[in-house]
């Protein structure tokens, strides 16, 4: 029996779809992924997480930490994942781990002696960008950039990206909770946690809600009546 063997539960809703994964200190034990867009993350991630928790209970594992994606990514997706992960961490009095989405793009790639620039397609010719050293440690903060003819990567650097970007580099699949769990495992073993009470996802670019034209006209109408 694995009666009290500790495991890490990873939850990812940062990009398209959602997923969960369970890992011990050495290997992935459980994973479930949904990568379509027809169903909202909010609808599925709760049930996926319950299934993962039930699986742990049935197999005698104890969830010792929660990991989630720190961002950047989908504003709504990040908020959903953060709320769920923080709720579980608070409710179970266990630590929380947050890993950069851009750092996950490097997982599984061969070693590289120079810098790696990770890019995440943000739509409309824009991207989230972050630079990492040969060991995978961030050299700067994630930024929001426009990929135009004037954009270029420093010489001798490697580019890895997700999405449809006009750059020369290595295209990788969007990361899932399996990737998150694999990377977060080292955080867990080093006890590298975030403050659950104060941590918020790194959106990089401030969220701007789009208000429909009818709502704008209604507000103008009400203001004139006041």
Language-model features: locations:
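DPxDG-like acidic metal-binding loop motif
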Residues: 65-101
